[in-house]
């Protein structure tokens, strides 16, 4: 890449450029509000790191304004605030992260209003295939991109760990009737493909309604079928209710894994000591060997800063910040940061290593590789087991690195213990 040509004023400072506005769709309230806490941290961190702004490829100093709007953990509201930030606030780019419920409706608005959009920490299947007019014949989107996880990656890291414990290979799937489940259970690209490949049997009860409080039907089926491995992606309240009922009703799997809810220690604390041994998705960890591109801070230093800022234990969802690192890299490289077309061209040529790992859109598209389609690069991923901690009640130990081989494994999986 060529260095930016800097235009300067008489005193040697770069010529002032227009303000770049970046809109953030954030679940500040509602069922996903734990993601909102992370957004509040990284917006503060980024604002301090950026100071007066960035020098773009046009040589001008562009101040960065971050606009945050609450999605209220609601998909309709996520779409509304994304549209408002584009039309009323004049945002040049929209960011969203966490789950398909927050990301996908916001992405549809960005596509409709022809505004660059970045996302992370969510499955790419609903983001890419779920938003197609004709899912059987998917076409690239022009404006919307993500550093996203594949449900096949999640299943891969889990089965690589499952095999370390002797079981009957019966996996009970616990999912709500939502877009997450559609991605996970996709017969062509989701969990069924990986389970079959590794010789596991999938036991799938009916999908529960989001926010359900009674899981008797699912538990009964798991017991009847002799399920020894639990796998799901659930909201915190759902998982808490399910697990307490499961133990009351005598369902004791050797392995229990869940996505989404276990990104936060608060979920485990709400369940209590009966949650020791749960297997979760490690989308980030303080021991990862990467640095923040804005400050040069290590992952451990970022975790320490987060704990000082919030008073809470660090969370893997801190990786939500990486999409902002990506956004800044794009605006620095775009020929004209104020021209959406050149911003999109800069997205397509991204080759950056963030605090969450690499994003390389210059790699050839390969459905089975890290760049599975034009709009997605896959994130790194490890399996963590939540154990009794030294500093905190629960601490995640990395037990599998099949989708992040440069990450150090900290221990072997242990079976769930029941008193």
Can you say where each PLM-predicted feature lies in the sequence?
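Extracytoplasmic ligand/sensor domains, especially the bilobed periplasmic-binding protein
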Residues: 91-205, 254-280
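Surface-exposed patches in mature extracellular/periplasmic domains of secreted proteins
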Residues: 56-64, 96-97, 173-176, 312-320, ...
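Extracytoplasmic "Venus flytrap"
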Residues: 14-16, 20-46, 69-75, 98-100, ...
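Hydrophobic alpha-helical
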Residues: 100-111, 213-214, 227-249, 323-328
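Extracellular/periplasmic periplasmic-binding protein-like sensory domains
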Residues: 149, 246-321, 333-334, 399-404, ...
């Amino acid at each position: 890449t060529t260095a930016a040509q800097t235009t300067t004023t008489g005193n040697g400072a770069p010529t002032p450029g227009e303000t770049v506005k970046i809109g953030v769709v954030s679940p500040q309230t509602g069922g996903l509000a734990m993601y909102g806490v992370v957004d509040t941290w990284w917006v503060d961190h980024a604002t301090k790191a950026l100071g007066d702004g960035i020098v773009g490829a046009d040589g001008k100093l562009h101040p960065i304004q971050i606009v945050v709007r609450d999605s209220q953990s609601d998909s309709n509201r996520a779409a509304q605030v994304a549209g408002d930030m584009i039309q009323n606030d004049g945002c040049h780019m929209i960011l969203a992260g966490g789950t398909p419920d927050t990301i996908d409706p916001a992405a549809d608005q960005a596509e409709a209003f022809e505004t660059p959009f970045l996302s992370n920490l969510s499955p790419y299947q609903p983001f890419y295939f779920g938003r197609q007019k004709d899912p059987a014949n998917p076409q690239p989107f022009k404006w919307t991109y993500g550093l996203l996880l594949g449900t096949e990656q999640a299943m891969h890291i889990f089965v690589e760990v499952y095999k370390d414990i002797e079981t009957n290979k019966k996996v009970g799937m616990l999912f709500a009737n939502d877009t997450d489940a559609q991605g996970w259970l996709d017969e062509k690209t989701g969990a069924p493909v990986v389970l079959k490949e590794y010789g596991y049997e999938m036991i799938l009860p009916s999908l529960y309604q989001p926010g359900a409080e009674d899981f008797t039907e699912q538990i009964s089926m798991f017991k009847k079928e002799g399920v020894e491995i639990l796998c799901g992606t659930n909201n915190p309240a759902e998982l808490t209710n399910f697990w307490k009922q499961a133990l009351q009703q005598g369902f004791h799997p050797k392995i229990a894994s869940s996505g989404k809810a276990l990104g936060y220690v608060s979920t485990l604390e709400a369940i209590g000591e009966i949650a020791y041994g749960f297997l979760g998705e490690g989308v980030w960890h303080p021991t990862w060997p990467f640095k923040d591109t804005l400050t040069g801070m290590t992952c451990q230093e970022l975790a320490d800063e987060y704990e000082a800022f919030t008073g809470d234990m660090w969370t893997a969802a801190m990786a939500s910040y990486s999409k902002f690192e990506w956004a800044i890299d794009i605006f620095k490289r775009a020929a004209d940061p104020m021209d959406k077309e050149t911003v999109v061209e800069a997205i397509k040529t991204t080759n950056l290593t963030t605090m969450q790992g690499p994003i390389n859109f210059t790699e050839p598209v390969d459905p089975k590789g890290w760049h599975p389609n034009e709009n997605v690069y896959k994130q790194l991923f490890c399996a963590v087991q939540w154990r009794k901690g030294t500093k905190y009640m629960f601490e995640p130990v990395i037990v599998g690195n099949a989708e992040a081989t440069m990450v150090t494994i900290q221990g072997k999986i242990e079976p769930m213990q029941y008193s």
